[in-house]
Amino acid sequence: MGFVPVLIQPANAQASNTTSDKLIAIDILLQPDQTMMSKANAVNDRLRENYAAGYSLGARHAPHVTLLQRFVRVKDLDTVTAAVAEVYAQNPPIGLQLKVEALDYVIWGGVAVTVFVVERTPALMQLHEKVIAAVEPFSMSGGTKAAFVGDDANSETIGWVEHFIPASSGPKYVAHVTLGVAHEDFVKAMKAAPFNAFTFGVKGAAVYHLGNFGTAAEKLWQYAP
């Protein structure tokens, strides 16, 4: 499904060369309504039954639809969120209706990271592209696990953020909601089962500090229209 990042150097990211330019890995995301939360938690329960070392959804693993993941300097966070707020003022995200088309997975760190694949509607793509343009002047490269919450960010997680542009953006953007992790054979069977598509709404928008497996681990900013 195009969910695995291609390790290509982003053309529009600057390198961070000084210790004063501390980087943070951020996720500019949409927050789903209760319909999605209920569906996501139901799948997560099944995943954790199969893989007890997995994580449960909640405040430190918030279900979401990513618009953009980037490394930025900590000192630029206020400017970044102001730029994103300007995009949302002209392109309101709250109330958008989105459709889940399928369940899929990718292998990261030896486990199957499981997701709902979300339809790329014109409104969603417009938000994605405008947020990229707004954040581009502040995007940095060279982030390490120190840029994430905790100290366990694996190479796949770091690479995903580093190479989100161009490997996971524009025509390669796969909108999704991450549901948790489990053993591949279990998730492969889930994927093969009949799937009932469903719609859900966007109730909010925020910026989070990323954790391992691309989880939304700590809220940094909440959009207030």
Predicted regions and their residues:
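Surface-exposed, active-site-proximal loop segments in enzymatic domains
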Residues: V115
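Acidic/polar active-site rim loop that often engages polyanionic ligands
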Residues: W108-A112
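Bacterial N-terminal signal peptides
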Residues: M1-V6
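Basic, often amphipathic N-terminal segments
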Residues: P10-I107, T121-A206, L210-P225
